[in-house]
């Protein structure tokens, strides 16, 4: 009966959409006796927790019932929290670890491993130091995980010190530790040391060789990687995939294809690597060929990465029929359209001229991310549907998504297409004041172009003055064009002079001013401009009417 009550209360905690913590109090948890079987239900729920909030609620439950004082239960809570990839959740797992009276090695290792796989791997060293100061000395897993963290941030010095500590610890040499050491030294650029560690290993496996192989390729040392690949005593499919990806990154598609064709066994990563190789150099027809061959000859099924790459190729080629076939394939195999896949589908239909279909896919996508919103906003803008793009932007904000720099390029371009100057001004101001997005040259370019088209030359000049001089030239050229359209010769002279100050040998200022003077019949100015160009040795042919 006690276990049933605990199970019910765990259900209340883990399902906040149906219950809340106030209902917990009504269950009189304080009156419940905690037996040896009590941790099982709450821990099974904790293992299924998918968010920081749910883990925090499970933690609160354990504190309230006294389960947190049980080392096994507390350690399991930390381990479950540490498996969540969210940085805040890993940090929370660390905070729980620091509150456990006598944490064991498993608990420390869970947090060290979590940080090693996170965006802040250097924090793993902090946990490792805390472990050294405690009663439990690191084991071989502790060393493996903390060395993996050093490899992640190329911490050569830290890795060297931990290597020394491992030797002094008297722990039996372990292939996992030594593989990680090879990776630490290799990723830090110390290839000679990495090779020495590899050569001294009493037992080497494919992972040992791959640790150095991947380090070479990460640094762009393709020739050295190939020499090592040819020397390898043992290869696995990952070894071949590394070489294909390395050649692809270097733009060596022919070499990548040779390795791909020589593979004894391929997995989905192999096919994706070959697709990426062709996409990287713009060979989109070949992307589709590899995809079709994968469907015909391979037991491997395309994954989300494959489909995104193929849809991007269809978009670049304008191949609507192939893109539609991929869409049918996705639906037929029950693949959920979300995130990058949704974005790729929206972009494909838009670039193939089917903006209505792009909007339909967007509306049907239940799990959107910022990239999906950005894609449809940009696509609507390109198709001249500026007002629709701004309506989508309003929906995006209303649904709680935070716009980024790409979002604002899309909405400012939309304003530009429909001539909505006041709305553009408001959005440009909101970028930094509300959404903390600093404007870049692209955002300034949208505003300067719109202001120029509306004849607001002086306001546009003020914006250009906020930009670093080395980026201002292209916007000043745009303004010169606007001056020509509106016949504003005085402003044009001022802008041209500034353009020439930035780059005396750039002929664009002379050329546009010569055209302006010619259109105004001021031929003496045209002649003076040509003389100045010769004086500055600017080679530019001018067509003067």
UniProtKB/Swiss-Prot annotation:
Residue windows of the PPR repeats: 104-138, 139-173, 174-204, 205-239, 240-266, 267-301, 303-337, 338-368, 369-403, 404-434, 440-474
Gene Ontology molecular-function annotations: RNA binding
Keywords: Repeat
Region described as Type E motif: 475-545
GO biological process, one term: RNA modification
Alphabetized Gene3D superfamilies for the sequence: Tetratricopeptide repeat domain
Family (UniProt): Belongs to the PPR family. PCMP-E subfamily.
UniProt cross-references to NCBIfam families, sorted A to Z: PPR
Protein name: Pentatricopeptide repeat-containing protein At4g18840
Species the sequence originates in: Arabidopsis thaliana
Lineage, top ranks: Eukaryota, Viridiplantae, Streptophyta, Embryophyta, Tracheophyta
Gene expressing this chain: PCMP-E101
